Design a protein with these regions (language model features):
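Iron-sulfur-associated redox domains of electron-transfer enzymes in respiratory
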Residues: 1-447
């Protein structure tokens, strides 16, 4: 039975009546019966009760103990069992460390890298390069969908797929009518897994299973995403990400260690090069798919150069709109929907055919990825709004880079993926979605 959460601090969530679905075959249903209870939609999505027993065991193993298990294994003399330990850090985690330790974001990245290497981590990467690929592939897919869209073939709106909580909810509850709109480009975490376990492994002459890959992320849903990452044939059955630790979990490890360790620059996938400067994509608290796809679509479809993307808040600050007008007509209408009240309204209108948007960046957390529950919470488990405001200010000051400007990404398309739009690029950078049949196994939420 669903262990319904009872958090009440998120005022942006709307509670809904949830009828009790039947269960079959004695297995855990995708969303267990809720005994006509009132639930928060965010709790429904973030709750771990819909995971299978096997997933539950695997999730429980993704913690600091698992991390230290590998570190300690590497200290033993049986070198055949040693692992190359790689940690990849999401850019939305860095403002948390900067705020936590009262450092600039560059200093925080160096402190984090130095601390991890002092423990025995071999390489520390930034996942921004993986987000480059995710955004570039999403840009191409949106343009294709826009050109193909018609009354007979409704390929729009395209909904982003970088947020694992939202994607799992779409797959498990909403089903095919909604998952057909999900962008097929893999999330930055999934791309990073392939970069580390495929490209980097070959550069180091290692088999994928010899690498233990840890992602540092702002939210707990990334742990579940790691379990669901499809294994590429090139990875020989190995998952791209072995363990996800939240920013808060890593901060605890740092606080328990020696804070006087020597700082170190973030590594890159390119030999001895180091990341001297922290950069991000153009998103208020996320990977910035909306802004980059909007600019690309404006240029590609309408030959319009958009330098500044102007957001307009509509019903609340977590639902914002961006439009492009040409000859007095709106030709592009994008939106960012954060938090479950806005997701709820979006799905309702989409099902009624009254949703006028071409593209929506969908994020489970109100305020975006910076507000992930793995970092923007008080010790008591409440939302830390003061910390969130501080992180937003820090994140806004990080220099923005456009994915098209990365020479390394273009190099990787050729060297690693055998060219842009190649069969290997499609296999490595795109995914498919598993949709449950609406019925006994779904939580039939009344929108």
């Amino acid at each position: 039975e669903c262990s319904k959460k009872t958090k009440t601090d998120d005022q942006d969530d709307l509670s809904v009546d949830a009828p009790s679905p039947a269960q079959e075959n004695g297995e855990k249903g995708e969303f267990h019966k809720l005994a006509d209870a009132k639930i928060f939609l965010s709790d429904c999505l973030a709750c771990d009760s819909c995971v299978t027993a096997e997933e539950g065991v695997q999730l429980s193993q993704q913690n600091a103990k698992d991390f230290f298990r590998v570190l300690n294994l590497n200290k033993k003399c049986d070198t055949s069992k040693h692992k190359v330990l790689v940690v990849s850090v999401c850019p939305q985690s860095l403002p948390y460390f900067a705020a936590k330790f009262n450092l600039s974001v560059t200093e925080a990245s160096r402190r984090l890298c130095g601390s991890l290497k002092s423990l025995g981590v071999h390489f520390v990467f930034d996942t921004t390069i993986a987000a480059d690929f995710s955004i570039l592939e999403s840009q191409k897919e949106f343009v294709r969908r826009y050109r193909q869209h018609s009354e007979e073939e409704r390929t729009l709106p395209m909904l982003t797929s970088a947020c694992p909580g939202w994607v799992r909810y779409a797959e498990r509850v909403l089903g095919r009518p909604i998952t057909a709109h999900l962008c097929t480009a893999k999330s930055p975490q999934q791309v990073m897994g392939s970069l580390v376990k495929d490209y980097f492994a070959r550069q180091q002459n290692l088999s994928p299973e010899k690498i233990f890959h840890v992602i540092v992320a702002p939210c707990y849903d990334k742990k579940l995403e790691a379990l669901q990452e499809g294994s590429l044939s090139a990875l020989h059955g190995s998952r791209g990400t072995d363990c996800v630790l939240t920013s808060g979990e890593i901060a605890q490890i740092m606080e328990q260690g020696d804070l006087s360790v020597k700082d170190a620059a973030i590594d890159t996938l390119f030999g001895d090069l180091r990341e001297d400067k922290v950069t991000r994509h153009d998103g208020a608290g996320s990977d910035g798919h909306l802004a980059h796809i909007f600019r690309h679509a404006a240029k590609e479809l309408f030959n319009e150069d958009v330098e500044e993307v102007t957001y307009r808040a509509l019903r609340n600050k977590d639902f914002q709109e961006v439009t492009l007008e040409k000859d007095g007509e709106v030709v592009l209408r994008f939106a960012a929907a954060c938090g479950f009240r806005n997701i709820q309204n979006m799905i309702l209108k989409l099902k009624k055919g009254k949703f006028p948007y071409h593209f929506v960046e969908v994020l489970a957390c109100a305020g975006g990825c910076l507000n992930g529950r793995g970092q923007a919470q008080t010790p008591e488990g409440h939302a830390d709004k003061a910390l969130l405001r501080q992180m937003e200010g820090i994140y806004a000051d990080i220099p923005v880079r456009r994915p098209e400007s990365s020479a390394h990404v273009q190099e990787l398309y050729q060297e690693w993926l055998e060219g842009i739009n190649s069969p290997k690029a499609r296999e490595v950078l795109h995914t498919t979605y598993q949709s449950q049949e609406r019925g006994a196994h779904s939580l039939d939420i009344k929108w």
